[in-house]
Amino acid sequence: MPYRLYQEEKQKAVNILNDIKVKLYNRGWFPATSGNLSYKLHDDPLYFAITSSGKDKGTVTHEDVIFVDKDAKPIEKTKLKPSAETKVHSQIYQRTDAGCVIHIHTVNNNFISQLYFEDGYVPIKDMEMIKALDIWKEDAFIKVPIIENFFDLDRLAEEAGKSINPEVPGLLIRNHGIYAWGRDEFEAKRHVEAFEFIFEYMRNMIIFKGCKDIF
């Protein structure tokens, strides 16, 4: 049965996404209109707000956000196009308890995803920042999944869904970027910041040591 989204719900989502995207744009994480972010509005049926395609994320306009269903189709009439990777967001919402998803392209996450691609994951341990990912274990060791950057976006979404590690709120796409999520916008932002801190540290250590075996 269709669920009616109220204007207040939609405006809240727009405000949240615009606030996050401008903050992360100012950190250089949305270059050349790349990346996307979304905010879940309803579980069953799944409805979420997502940034529209091809927009400069350093500015705020009335055409920045579109509302879609689990099949990445707009739930209301619009001339806007949802992000090309909307189906990946849908997979994350359907397979996790995420309430917000952030996808960014940076030099650090591209470097790390390419270097560790053949392993299928990025190994991370012995770092205090792991706690920022809600992983509170002594001697914590995590594996951030990496998948191929498939041109076919349906296949990309399918592989992303199959590769999600429920214990790790992030997924890398080789030479593309990272998806990070959280139960709300605060968690999602914290998680993507933690991943980027970790990847920057790893990249610097790899260059310094001359090998990827840094832990």
UniProtKB/Swiss-Prot annotation:
<dbReference type="GO" id="GO:0019509">
    <property type="term" value="P:L-methionine salvage from methylthioadenosine"/>
</dbReference>
<comment type="similarity">
    <text>Belongs to the aldolase class II family. MtnB subfamily.</text>
</comment>
<dbReference type="InterPro" id="IPR017714">
    <property type="entry name" value="MethylthioRu-1-P_deHdtase_MtnB"/>
</dbReference>
<keyword id="KW-0486">Methionine biosynthesis</keyword>
<dbReference type="InterPro" id="IPR036409">
    <property type="entry name" value="Aldolase_II/adducin_N_sf"/>
</dbReference>
<protein>
    <recommendedName>
        <fullName>Methylthioribulose-1-phosphate dehydratase</fullName>
        <ecNumber>4.2.1.109</ecNumber>
    </recommendedName>
</protein>
<keyword id="KW-0479">Metal-binding</keyword>
<comment type="function">
    <text>Catalyzes the dehydration of methylthioribulose-1-phosphate (MTRu-1-P) into 2,3-diketo-5-methylthiopentyl-1-phosphate (DK-MTP-1-P).</text>
</comment>
<dbReference type="Pfam" id="PF00596">
    <property type="entry name" value="Aldolase_II"/>
</dbReference>
<dbReference type="InterPro" id="IPR001303">
    <property type="entry name" value="Aldolase_II/adducin_N"/>
</dbReference>
<feature type="binding site">
    <location>
        <position position="103"/>
    </location>
    <ligand>
        <name>Zn(2+)</name>
    </ligand>
</feature>
<dbReference type="GO" id="GO:0046570">
    <property type="term" value="F:methylthioribulose 1-phosphate dehydratase activity"/>
</dbReference>
<keyword id="KW-0862">Zinc</keyword>
<feature type="binding site">
    <location>
        <position position="105"/>
    </location>
    <ligand>
        <name>Zn(2+)</name>
    </ligand>
</feature>
<dbReference type="GO" id="GO:0008270">
    <property type="term" value="F:zinc ion binding"/>
</dbReference>
<keyword id="KW-0456">Lyase</keyword>
<dbReference type="GO" id="GO:0005737">
    <property type="term" value="C:cytoplasm"/>
</dbReference>
<comment type="pathway">
    <text>Amino-acid biosynthesis; L-methionine biosynthesis via salvage pathway; L-methionine from S-methyl-5-thio-alpha-D-ribose 1-phosphate: step 2/6.</text>
</comment>
<keyword id="KW-0028">Amino-acid biosynthesis</keyword>
